[in-house]
Amino acid sequence: AAAAENLEAYRVAVVTESPRMVMRWRGQTIADLSRAFLDTNGATKHASVAVPARECAAPAAAQTLRGMAGSLKSASRRGLVERFDSTVGAGTLLMPFGGRTQRSPAQAMAALLPVLPGEKTAQGSVMAWGCDPDALSADPYRGAHDAVYTSVAKLVAAGADYHKAYLSLQEFFEKLRNEPARWGKPFAALLGALDAQLELSAAAIGGKDSMSGSFLDRDVPPTLISFAIAPLLEGELLTTDLKAADHGIYLFAGKTPEQQTAAWERFTALARAGKVVSAWAVENGLAEAVMKMSFGNEIGFAAENTVLDWFAPMPGAIVAELSDEVSDAVRIGVTTAEKAIALGADSASIEELAALNDAVLEAVYPTKTRDSGTVESFSHETKTRVAPAVKQARPKALIPVFP
């Protein structure tokens, strides 16, 4: 059989019933060993060993915080935002960036309702959006579901009542081409958004699709953006920047839809009672929340809860700065006069984190002018003009009369 395959084959051994291994060479037995001896692998040997324990430590929290501050996902968009006029109509209630340094980004747009000339109103509206491209690409159902929760959570963090929220969804998807796998992406995303709407009793009014499609081998990523809007009074509006040291920082979150909405209701009750000083709807983790809240007034933060995952996404959760102690929310830390974010033993300065955050898109949307030099000053001399103290104008008028 081997010759038919052009292979050389030789018989080198025969399996027997005898429990011995016998080797012969040129008619002489050169080895005759018991199978039991072979099973022992020869004489037993002993040796002392020492294996040092290796520490599989995760990166320090401050190091991870610096990496997040310098990532595109968390980057400051101040250079882009400042290209638009946020004061048109003189009804703006919430500027795009808050705090003394104007560095804590607002998570919602709030403005007074337009009224007739001469009339005034305290009634306004607040609008926010939610979308995580990474989550949508990984799981369109979960990504769309979380987008709805995030948009509504931003309204709640701004002071609105989630029961009064309405939604509008905008979707982008690749060309479907009658391929079930491609059809599955918008199906899963819309199903996730619908489930979130049913859980929150928030209806979506209309929608928009203007960028779907594919070009050659390139597809738009699965995208569903949730826009949420709700009414609120001018005095109910909350901002995102931390206000003072020695304030408790609390987390309002739930693992189920019922727990999450109950947490929102507790937050709203505290806000109406005047106990909420500032708030942030969590998107990319608790660490990002306290970091961006600290930018505005350079108020520091010291973590007190070592169980939480500070960098895990928590769609729907709200971090709030409270002026009084409360027992029906999870306290995660306290504000400090030190200009640093401390997540355990290590910390990072607010100045360093803000610089990293600003630098990501500085080349694309600059916040500083590249020109240098002096600004030319313009001045005009005033002259005295003589005018009569008593006006004695004698106007003449021609009135044509026809009989």
Write out the residue ranges for each language-model feature:
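Glycine/proline-enriched, intrinsically flexible loops and inter-domain linkers
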Residues: 1-403
